[in-house]
């Protein structure tokens, strides 16, 4: 579930607001080093037989940062605008001294062809903060620590046996989801409006807390099955963190600005991280003490697994700081992708009543009306999975995937990719590429339904026609968990006879394409559900 935010419009806006101050500091430096940099660039280009990917001519030292800051657009929009001007599936902009190579063409499958060379991550203030100094796996640069943590995750946390071991906890949260929505809907008279974003995000938060910490609540349990104040704080901090990491902050490309915090980016990161780590930290410290004192014996959740891991010499594999870092990694990657996909799928399906009808008919045929959806039903819920795939394609949770760093010079699609370049795959560009998809802005789940009715629809996309859980050496390794969470969330909401005959027609939802929330902002249309006369509907909420 590689879905860590890469390019936040909210952060982009704050960068634009401080552009004048930044430029006043930068321009004198530009003049001083212009000749030196030009000489170095010419020598560098003379040693390369292949050209850089097309893109705007950079300024010395600052690269294309002035254009990005003065564009008054979020960084991800500006980069996509540059790619539209070049008219190619690959483009290069230079931010400070870093070449940022954006790709929208699935045929340029560099992560398959040169996987190891692009297996590292950028070193940024946000990634260092959220990973506790690169102790975990997702944001760590390629090296021994990443290999160690990746090995722990693959062999102990997301392996098939562990997935099966945690089944009952996931099932409890799926059942609680249905109960919570029912309680919310019954709270009003004549039908109630239920915020799908709120429900979806907190379902994901509940699942993560149950799997990792063995509890749904940090504080007092709530009678309706919903989150309490502490749980709301934790989930809000998680989504704030996801919106800040890899957000094209100026100081990530001009390290000598680090500490000035001209745009307030560093302050926001520290605050989000403190809120993100405070509550889990108390649980982890207490659990660590219980195991070391012999007070606790049996394994009950993933935290127990991490604490008790031992090597061949019976020595602990992980320190307490590494346990905290991995716990935060798991929390961040598991929350946003399923909730975003389900929210957008519901919003789009309201505009296409036929899709709601087909989804309801599939649930009737597979599940029936006398029980709730179970994970064992997932292989047969192909149309529901097709709807989720289409949401992943058309409405990705973030504009770009997590950046890959080139460990050595490389040639991709005939272009030179210098060592240290940040390579970003555009989730928007891939999923909406008209050369790959017919009518790419149309929500059409049937495009994912195979002609063979016995074939299985999966949420993964190995051909990079769109990105759900990513691919390659740095791909998400928890696709099974991501699939289970996405389908159970989607089916759990649809189970209340969504859009079936006999009820009132739902209102239309305006599905805006990244006119707001792309990595954390909330300006787009928000879907909500209403229980009216016993039927579930999705309606527009401004």
List the predicted regions and their residue ranges.
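Hydrophobic, repeat-rich solenoid/adaptor surfaces of innate immune receptors and signaling proteins
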Residues: 102-106, 177, 211-212, 279-284, ...
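Cytochrome P450 heme-thiolate monooxygenase catalytic core
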Residues: 122-130, 164-342, 358, 375
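Cytochrome P450 proximal C-terminal region
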Residues: 2-15, 24, 53, 83, ...
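Conserved, non-catalytic sequence blocks in retroelement Pol enzymes and Pol-derived host proteins
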Residues: 19-21, 48-53, 68-72, 158-167, ...
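Cytochrome P450 catalytic-core helices
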Residues: 337-355, 360-362, 480-496
């Amino acid at each position: 579930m590689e879905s860590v935010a890469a390019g936040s419009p909210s952060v982009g806006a704050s960068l634009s607001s401080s552009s004048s101050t930044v430029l006043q500091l930068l321009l004198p430096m530009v003049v001083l080093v212009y000749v030196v940099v030009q000489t170095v660039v010419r020598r560098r280009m003379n040693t390369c037989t292949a050209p850089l990917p097309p893109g705007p001519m950079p300024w010395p030292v600052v690269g294309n940062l002035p254009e990005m800051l003065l564009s008054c657009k979020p960084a991800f929009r500006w980069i996509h605008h540059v790619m539209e001007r070049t008219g190619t599936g690959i483009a290069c902009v230079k931010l400070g001294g870093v070449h940022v190579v954006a790709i929208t063409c699935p045929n340029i499958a560099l992560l398959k062809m040169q996987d190891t060379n692009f297996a590292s991550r950028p070193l940024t203030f946000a990634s260092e903060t959220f990973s506790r100094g690169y102790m975990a796996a997702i944001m760590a640069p390629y090296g021994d620590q990443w290999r160690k943590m990746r090995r722990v995750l693959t062999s102990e946390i997301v392996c098939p046996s562990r997935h099966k071991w945690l089944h009952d906890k996931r099932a409890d949260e799926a059942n609680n989801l249905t109960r919570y929505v029912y309680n919310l809907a019954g709270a009003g008279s004549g039908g109630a409006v239920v915020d799908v974003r709120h429900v979806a995000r907190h379902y994901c938060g509940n699942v993560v807390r149950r799997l990792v910490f063995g509890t749904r609540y940090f504080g007092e349990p709530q009678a309706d099955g919903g989150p309490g104040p502490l749980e709301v704080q934790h989930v809000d901090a998680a989504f704030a963190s996801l919106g800040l990491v890899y957000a094209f902050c100026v100081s990530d490309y001009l390290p000598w600005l680090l500490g000035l915090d001209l745009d307030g980016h560093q302050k926001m990161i520290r605050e989000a991280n403190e809120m993100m780590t405070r509550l889990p930290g108390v649980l982890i410290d207490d659990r660590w003490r219980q195991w070391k004192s012999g007070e606790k014996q049996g394994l009950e959740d993933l935290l127990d697994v991490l604490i008790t891991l031992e090597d061949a010499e019976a020595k602990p594999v992980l320190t307490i700081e590494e346990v905290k870092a991995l716990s935060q990694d798991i929390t961040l990657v598991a929350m946003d992708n399923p909730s975003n996909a389900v929210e957008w799928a519901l919003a789009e399906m309201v505009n296409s009543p036929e899709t709601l009808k087909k989804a309801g008919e599939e649930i009737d045929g597979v599940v029936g009306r006398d029980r709730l959806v179970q994970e064992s039903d997932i292989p047969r819920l192909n149309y529901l999975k097709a709807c989720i795939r289409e949401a992943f394609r058309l409405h990705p949770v973030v504009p770009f995937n997590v950046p890959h760093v080139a460990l050595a010079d490389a040639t991709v699609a005939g272009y030179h990719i210098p060592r240290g370049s940040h390579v970003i795959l555009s989730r928007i560009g891939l999923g909406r590429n008209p050369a790959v998809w017919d009518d790419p802005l149309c929500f059409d789940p049937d495009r994912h339904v195979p002609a063979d009715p016995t074939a299985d629809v999966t949420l993964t996309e190995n051909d990079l026609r769109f990105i759900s859980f990513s691919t390659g050496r740095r791909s998400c390794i928890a696709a099974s968990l991501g699939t289970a969470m996405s389908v159970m969330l989607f089916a759990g909401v649809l189970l209340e006879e969504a859009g079936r005959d006999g009820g009132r027609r739902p209102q239309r939802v305006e599905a805006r394409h990244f006119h707001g929330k792309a990595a954390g902002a909330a300006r787009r249309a928000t879907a909500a559900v209403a229980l009216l006369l016993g039927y579930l509907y999705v309606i527009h909420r401004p």
